[in-house]
Amino acid sequence: MLKAYERLDHTHGEIVDSITLDQDTRKKARIKGTTDGGADIGIFMERGHPLLVGEILKTECGVFVEIKGEAEPVSTAIATDWLTFCKVCYHLGNRHTSLQIGELWLRFKPDHVLEALAEKYGLSIDKTPAVFEPESGAYGGKGGHSHAHSDNISNDKHSHAHAH
């Protein structure tokens, strides 16, 4: 079994495997799973610092494993103007719910109350499963940013790791 205890800022070594995890699993400090290549892996990280999509883990035997996000049920609320978008972000933020924020779109776990609030302000709701990468919060420290560089709601990532 591979065992990973270390996150890397970057690597010049070859990333030989990956593991695809949903958001709830990425929040866990101890994960036992199977890599996308079929290897058993144990991930042992510090508590309170979720794994981020695009991060690289180094196993104790020197193998580099990339964290990938699994598409999961989400609601993506899409706005057509910035003022309305800001108002909805404000109201949903006051509910202390996990949100992923993009340009004129925000994403949250399916919740009919939150969907109704967004629709009340004229946002459309897209329920297509997607990778969920919520903001870490004002005091969250690590994470909270996307590695995507697109203005749309795509989850395409670039291939190098960042310091977190």
Predicted regions and their residues:
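Helix-rich terminal scaffold detector
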Residues: 1-13, 109, 114-164
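Extended boundary segments
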Residues: 1-25, 101-102
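Short, structured beta-strand/loop micro-motifs enriched in basic residues and often containing a Trp
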Residues: 34-42, 46, 102-103
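A generic structural motif
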Residues: 42, 75, 105-109
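Short, well-ordered loop/turn sites that connect or cap secondary structure elements
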Residues: 45, 51, 57-59
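Small-residue-biased structural context
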Residues: 49-52, 65, 106, 124
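Short glycine-/aliphatic-rich beta-strand segments at the starts of folded cytosolic domains
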Residues: 66-79
